[in-house]
Amino acid sequence: MNRRYVLSLSGALLASSCMTVLVAVPVARAQQASTAMTTAATSATAAPRQILLQQARFWLQQQQYDNARQALQNAERIAPNSPDVLEVLGEYQTAIGNREAAADTLRHLQQVAPGSAAAGNLNDLLSERAISQSDLSQIRSLAGSGQNAQAVAGYQKLFHGGKPPHSLAVEYYQTMAGVPAQWDQARAGLAGVVASNPQDYRAQLAFAQALTYNTSTRMEGLTRLKDLQSFRSQAPVEAAAAAQSYRQTLSWLPVNPETQPLMEQWLSAHPNDTALREHMLHPPGGPPDKAGLARQAGYQQLNAGRLAAAEQSFQSALQINSHDADSLGGMGLVSMRQGDTAEARRYFEEAMAADPKTADRWRPALAGMAVSGEYASVRQLIAAHQYTEAKQQLATLARQPGQYTGATLMLADLQRSTGQIAAAEQEYRGILSREPNNQLALMGLARVDMAQGNTAEARQLLSRVGPQYASQVGEIEVSGLMAAASQTSDSARKVSILREAMAQAPRDPWVRINLANALQQQGDVAEAGRVMQPILANPVTAQDRQAGILYTYGSGNDAMTRQLLAGLSPADYSPAIRSIAEEMEIKQDLASRLSMVSNPVPLIREALTQPDPTGARGVAVADLFRQRGDMVHARMALRIASTRTIDLSPDQRLSYATEYMKISNPVAAARLLAPLGDGTGSATGSALLPEQVQTLQQLRMGISVAQSDLLNQRGDQAQAYDHLAPALQADPEATSPKLALARLYNGHGKPGKALEIDLAVLRHNPQDLDARQAAVQAAVNSDHNSLATRLAMDGVQESPMDARAWLAMAVADQADGHGQRTIEDLRRAYDLRLQQVEGTRAASGAGAAQEDALAPPSTNPFRPRGYGHQTELGAPVTGGSYSAEAASPDTSDQMLSSIAGQIRTLRENLAPSIDGGLGFRSRSGEHGMGRLTEANIPIVGRLPLQAGASALTFSITPTMIWSGNLNTGSVYDVPRYGTMMGVQAYNQYDSYTNAGRDQQRIAAGTAEAGFAPDVQFGNSWVRADVGASPIGFPITNVLGGVEFSPRVGPVTFRVSAERRSITNSVLSYGGLRDTNYNSALGRYARQVYGQALSKQWGSEWGGVVTNHFHGQVEATLGNTILYGGGGYAIQTGKNVQRNSEREAGIGANTLVWHNANMLVRIGVSLTYFGYAKNEDFYTYGQGGYFSPQSYYAATVPVRYAGQHKRLDWDVTGSVGYQVFHEHSAPFFPTSSLLQSGANTIASNYSASATPAEYLSEETVNSAYYPGDSIAGLTGGFNARVGYRFTRNVRLDLSGRYQKAGNWTESGAMISAHYLIMDQ
């Protein structure tokens, strides 16, 4: 393990021994790194313009001109008149053959920056186009035949003795490098080309090859060639050539301790390379010193704590030379570390006998053997984490003669490593009071001061340390910087401190992983990958692999983690590494078995039957399902694991809680952590280790933020703040609680206050893209669009290679109504994220470059979801399969899925569309009256406006309705239709008197047809339309309405005013013509009653519209929606009695179950409405619509919705109970004359006729319809299923059934939706 995280044996032994014997203890900083890496996102913080221009040049080299143009346009948006931008613009124009445009760009560049290098380069490029291609081909032939000197002369002549054009510079200097006398000039020229464009892989290859030509730079060239091999996906030709050159260069090298590892590494990847193997066995300069190599490897392994490997290397050396004193002494040190004192003594004595001249090296080790047994016992206790017993034994040992200093130093080191800083400081000062210049005590006390932030005092102590400890002093200074970084939650400050530490210790893997961790927390994941690249690409030491394993594990890259574990000896496993190794083994075994079953539950239970003392097993099983998107079984695994034993260990609680946070269950995580208290042991009686306390604090902060966000989504900002307050107070510098507080203000309808907080965080750390995204959104929410645009532009300039910067830009552009620009922003974000994800996955595959695996996927278990999102369906996932194959990037990566969904939605919103369908509707009732059958063919066109934020919709709906045929022979039905009561009475009277007159005709039924036009405008908070009921119906009405629905946090207010047709019947929908109006009987009646009857009787009646005014409040509280509202309406129609309605309702529904692609909601609804008059009849003046005087209903609706691949569905069913009451109503409410006649007919026929012969007594009794009170069940269903054939074409089928009041209604429709956009 790292020598800076270990404990010394004793001061006396260390001072007198030639080699330090180290005691391995848990690596605190490494474990902290593993627990802190729970979030990731993409970022890069290089100069934006240069990065974009480098990209443009890269795409130009690949001849992908569209990509080059996009990168160049982005650079132009940042600095349109920058010389380097104009230079690349000219290169692009030249590449696509537009020489005139390139010449114009050159003239503009010479005006903007006369004499600049950019102008010169572009001028050279245009000049190169005038070069004779035949001369150039001849020169290239000379170079190809090995005549480099002549070729260089030809190039110089071609360039008129000047600088080569940019496009020919690489081949010119590459040829020059083959001329020994001109090699320095060639190297300088290639170095300049590479510096000007690092993305030029061809130049990188030429430069690396040229360096290998010279022995003084050969190793640097090898390093560059190895780096180039990692760019197989970006530059496959150059990567392959680099591999060939690397192999060739190996054959030029001598075989020595420096070069042998490189050759062995090549052979491990290319075991069939017999030529290189022969070169190693029989090098040109004679055989290598095999014994010396083995001995050197043994001491390196011993220093790294790899005892088994060191023993094997020393034994190999002794097989060659059994009297090798250094190897014998090395075996003695190995035996002493292993606790075998007798064997150690034998080896030391043999080493002293083999070479008396070096005997003094081993005598101090022999002298220390007297107490080594007791120290070995202490080491075993420490290895077993029995720190209390180890401290007691050291205190006893310190009281023995001559052991005070050594035992006290070891005790102080142990106290310091276990967090007892004050006690360690006291012990160090005790030693220094006796031995003021004890070097180890001075360094130990300096470490304490560094950890406490007393940098000045620590450096004063280190100034007293001798030069022989220079390396240790440097390590302590670096440790101090890392301690200072760990004590600040200011991410920008932390990164700055750790960069300073890495500058002092560039190869230290623990510095690198802490810096990478800090960069990830800041959002700079791409930069974090670059920081870790050297140790991941070429892990030299066990510590490199340990740090790499912790990094890749925290990044979720299991394949790379397994790859690094394969190269690490189990002897080098720390507790954290061992836990990771166990988790990888469990996941791999379970994944292979899951592919053979359909139900994973038995396998989960079986996997969790074994003991799980650290929590690694439960986490492994849960994480396997989490990575597959199966949160149901992930939660099940954690629930089983955390309830198998009552007394969970701190490691188990911390591990399970961390995994619960990854699956967004902060409540379960908080419940697991509650027994740990604050970690001091006051609640449990056992204090946690420092790294466990740090993990506990991080989890508690994440839980506070997550619970606050959940309550915020439910609209309970007060309780949300109560949860958040401890996190705000515990660390006032922490960013995530501040951003959560801003979200609370935003949820409370105060986006201005949220913006203030977001801007304050952003001012403190301008690189924090999470804060920048939040600020952009808050600025848009508070109608500060110009500020949002400025903030987003700054983010793009700061981090042009970070997807989140472009997502913020998309928010700003969409708010400004720039639809196409928004899509470009989102596509840019998608491409950046895809590059990262594909790079990560490619690296885990066979033969892929390890450097591409450095960028972890973006997963943030603490990130809140927006209001209302909990009711939406998730992106489709592959269900039912547990194969080990990886999903495609855009479906398995959360950020990619989100961006792809936004692009898809925005493209659809921006695309005009056409819908067409065929629908049928049937409503119960008597034939010829209440019964209604409808067929319609809606044709709808939609035109998006304002970047899809609003739309203009045009529709025309051909419609046919019919009521069936009236039963003309029914003495019950006929009188209740139109004015047929009088006709029936006349006909029966005529028949009774045998007058012989012609009987009046009775209407047999009604059918109507027409088309309904409509124009609608709508956006997120207002909708308005104007149209008409079907033109062609007897009565046509102008219709329309407007609705306002502003939203304040989780609360939506709806206010609407509308005029709509009542479509209960043919009468109410289209109106009816009274056939009696122009009949002989009708004309006779008007003659008799004159003007009085003409005013009360017309040829048509019906066509009822409701003029409705409604208000409603809706509140989204997490997964629950509450609503309540009421309204008032006035119903009018042609020759129909005016009516009025009041209505009110309240209800709620909540999400009761969901997974990645399905949901179930259940609710309750209470409804009331009542009309002033009962107009549910079909005589003249009645409206023909259900209008009870009071109606009450309580229903329970259940909704089931989901989607799978291209199919989606939505089914809602409800059942309830209704009670309604209808008053009696006159036959002819609008005509006193007709009603008077009805009264006369009713009284006469009721008294003198029998029902079989005349009008039904039941029908005409008092000429009033009777009232009624009814109670019973109500309910129905509404179902829709849709299938998307392509991105443009979608087909929907829907059906419904409803029973309410005194009617039932059913309907069905098939419709097609077509988006007018490119495939």
From Swiss-Prot:
Q: Please note every region of biased composition (Low complexity).
A: 841-855
Q: Which UniProt keywords apply?
A: Cell outer membrane, Cellulose biosynthesis, Membrane, Repeat, Signal, TPR repeat
Q: Which organism is it from?
A: Komagataeibacter xylinus (Gluconacetobacter xylinus)
Function (record text): Required for maximal bacterial cellulose synthesis. It may be involved in the formation of a membrane complex for extrusion of the cellulose product.
Name of the protein described by the UniProt record: Cellulose synthase operon protein C
Q: Which GO terms describe its cellular component?
A: cell outer membrane
Q: Where found in the cell?
A: Cell outer membrane
Gene from which the chain derives: bcsC
UniProt-annotated stretches for the region Disordered: 841-890
Q: Please give the family membership noted in the entry.
A: Belongs to the AcsC/BcsC family.
Q: What ranges cover the TPR repeats?
A: 49-82, 84-116, 291-324, 325-358, 405-438, 557-590, 701-734, 736-768, 1059-1094
Q: How does the record say this protein sits in the membrane?
A: Peripheral membrane protein
